[in-house]
């Protein structure tokens, strides 16, 4: 049977990947998946995660 609860799987995508124009780096998009509790966190998640394409920590925002 499926789990019941308020936890939902969300995808986080880097916000700086599209705006960066560094020619030495590839134009890949960094994405992470995580879970959040919809009851406690109603707004969109925004976390600092490592982006391997830019080789540094960047802000990742929740996408639909």
From Swiss-Prot:
GO BP field: translation
InterPro entries recorded: Ribosomal_bL33 (IPR001705), Ribosomal_bL33_sf (IPR038584), Ribosomal_zn-bd (IPR011332)
Basic and acidic residues: compositionally biased ranges: 16-25, 33-42
GO cellular component, as recorded: cytoplasm; ribonucleoprotein complex; ribosome
Keyword Plastid: no
Region listing for Disordered, in residue ranges: 16-42
GO molecular function: structural constituent of ribosome
Key words of the record: Ribonucleoprotein, Ribosomal protein
The family this protein is said to belong to: Belongs to the bacterial ribosomal protein bL33 family.
NCBIfam families found in the cross-reference section: PRK00504.1, PRK00595.1, rpmG_bact
Listed name of the protein: Large ribosomal subunit protein bL33
Organism field: Prochlorococcus marinus (strain MIT 9301)
Gene that this polypeptide is encoded by: rpmG
